Amino acid sequence: VVGLWEKVKAQEKNHAPDKKASALDGVPMHCPALIQAEKLQKKAAKLGFDWSRQEEIVDKIQEELNELREAMKSGDDARIDEELGDLLFAASNLSRFRKRRSGELLLGTANRKFKTRFMFMEKELAAQGKKFEDCNIGELEALWQKAKGK
């Protein structure tokens, strides 16, 4: 029964009058957004909509960063959100283009690195009998730099 139900739903989907086929169809919308971005970009790349060199993507990332700075100057939260999303999308495109490791794996590595450094800072502060709240941003930045050196 389940198999028949899935066949009927698939046929309805393929024959829906308002449904337009897209080369991007089939990218699951339930997976993490970073994975979605890479899958969308990969499908577009297969059709020739891709960069020829990774440096071009870095330039695009810089362009998106500049647009984010402009949006921040305007104070328009919706525009800031849009530009921040564009920046994240462009950055994910670089990991997709390089074909070494997925952006999801790279971000996971960065998360673990951040956590390790933050925990180092916590230990250093505890050894000094301090808490984060006791420090100004300059002191915290100095601790962060020390953590990066470890």
Q: Where does each model-flagged region fall?
A:
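Flexible "arm" and connector segments at domain edges
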Residues: V1-L84, F89-K150
